[in-house]
Amino acid sequence: MAALRAGDAGTAFARLSLLKEGAPGIPAPWLLIAQAAERLGDDAEAEVALAHYLKDEPRHLGALLMMAALKVRGGDERAAQTFYRTALGAATQPGATIAPVLVPMLRAGEAFLAASTTRFSAHLEAAVDATGLADGVAGARIRQAIDLLLGRSDLFVQQPSMFYFPGLAQRSFFERDEFAWLASIEAAVPAMRAEASAAMAAHTGFEPYVRSSPDRPPPANPLRDDPNWSAFHLWQGGLPVADNAARCPATMAALDHAPIPVIAGRSPMAIYSLLTPGTHIQPHHGLLNTRLICHVPLIAPAGCGLRVGAETRTWRPGETLIFDDSFEHEAWNRGTEARVVLLFEIWRPELTATERAALTDLFEAIDRYQGVAIDAG
């Protein structure tokens, strides 16, 4: 110890090496041996000593940082990443104390990991580009996987707030070409847009999407009773809204093409959903994962977006967005005019006819329990 403190690394290493076998109840001074070897420039001997020490003290911060630095010098980037990540994890544990001398080593580790992630990301993206799968749905999913691998994105899964049906694919968005019936609805977009515009011009029929009820606690939603997010109900609680439906015959006819659930007191459900400029629907989860939500854009100004899970898409006139609202999702209008979509729900396509019938019976039984639908859409 005295020789090491005096800067005589050679003497220190020689004397400490005599103690490698240790003694009963006294462990070998592997960390000191490693420090002496490192000062001598003998990285190989330092690594051996640190490996012995970390076997007994796997979360010793100083030893982890020393080993990481040795791996960097030795060109073993992946090993260095592992030791630096373990060290940073140990440093952030509750109650962890960090000696001042280790702080620069921790900062060096953070910088190394950031640079390493950048290099690794570029390598993976180049590999994906070389496969020719960089575009389209397959490419998007590969890039999402890379983002998860590199920690650039959080993992989102179905988290319905009321009812979870197991075994369904964890997909945030579905693609238009998966639904043959959708073309018939999209063909009616010009007529539906005219009907929605007429409803807006009449200033009647729209009401806040999230409403308070006198016999329930107020919803914990910042847009509660706020007309900036409004709904023009065409179907509500399984029944057509007569006055509104009569004003929108083309829309009502178009909805007949969709596989909308028919559940007493609950579905069909269909609305014009209006979002005014500057309005942001905060992240939230839907109640069920047995349905998909369809947005048929009727008025789709620039500056609007929908994030479902880790993926963000924009509305384009006439191009339906289909998504699983049991994933965390949010929407915003940063444009200069209102965004209006035709919103309705459909069965998940994976559900068999038998499962759909059973779920219909189950949801109706749930709603009969107190005579009130838990989810009206």
Where are these regions (language model features)?
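Canonical positions in the second alpha-helix
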Residues: L18-L19, H52-Y53, T86-A87
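Short coil turns that delineate tetratricopeptide repeat
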Residues: P24, E57-P58, T92
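Fe(II)/2-oxoglutarate oxygenase catalytic core
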Residues: A69, R73-G75, A79-Q81, R85-I271, ...
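A short beta-strand-loop-beta hairpin characteristic of the jelly-roll/cupin
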Residues: I299-P317
